[in-house]
Amino acid sequence: MQQWSEAITVEFRRGEFVESSHRVHAVVATADQMISVWGDGERMTMPRSAIKSIQVLPMIALGAAAAFDVSDDEVALAASSHNAEGAHTTAVAAWLQRIGLGVEALECGPSDPISDLACKALYAAGEPPTSLHNCCSGKHTGFLTLARHLADDPTLALPGYLDPEHGVQTRVRDAQALMTNVDLSNQTPVIDGCGIPVYQFPLASLAQAMARLVMPSAVPAEFQSAA
């Protein structure tokens, strides 16, 4: 492994003046080993939206995606942040309708579209943003799809799917723990911007988890079919 003692420094300059300076810790990894580290590879971090591609795995692996004919485009919406352009909000609304729910079921809350053009168009039309416009509405619809699929489980009642001990969130937590090899059982989660519980991970563990995600043979058996 190539270890660099210093974090990468990124400077924003205005002319010759350094306006701001940012230290970047970085890891390059395969599924089972570190290749290069800049700064502190064990630095604890909250991946937030960067871990959506792992948070979506239970919906696929537990059969919810197949049961509700979730398309590849919808999986992409669940595994990423969208701009709330028309194609995105229309797709999320149609997905919700297919699982028998409406926008009111989304507990992410409303927010302005990330896209400046979409945001300006929304306000020009005199329409307030809804939860569909939240960049995480696809992820939340994925959570709701899992809850609907496993509706016989009393821990998956709706509403309330944001609770850390709700059946959706315990399954998502377990997926993150398995993919990163990090024990989350004693970690107290904090709340992300869209309301879900989030956890801290060593940077190196996140790098290896992402490497595993694109190498299905390295994915834990529970999620190989979903990777």
What residues fall within each predicted segment?
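Phosphate-handling active-site elements
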Residues: A64-D72
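A generic local secondary-structure boundary/capping motif
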Residues: G15-E16, S131-C135, G195-V198
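Beta-lactamase-like hydrolase cores
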Residues: M1-E42
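Active-site-adjacent structural elements in folded domains
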Residues: G41, V190-C194
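Active-site SXXK
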Residues: P47-A65
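Active-site-adjacent helix/loop patches that line small-molecule binding or acyl-intermediate pockets
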Residues: M1-Q3, S71-N186, R212
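Short, conserved micro-motifs enriched in small and acidic residues
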Residues: M44-S53, I196-Q200
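Active-site-proximal alpha-helical segments within enzyme catalytic domains
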Residues: P197-P216, E222, A226-A227
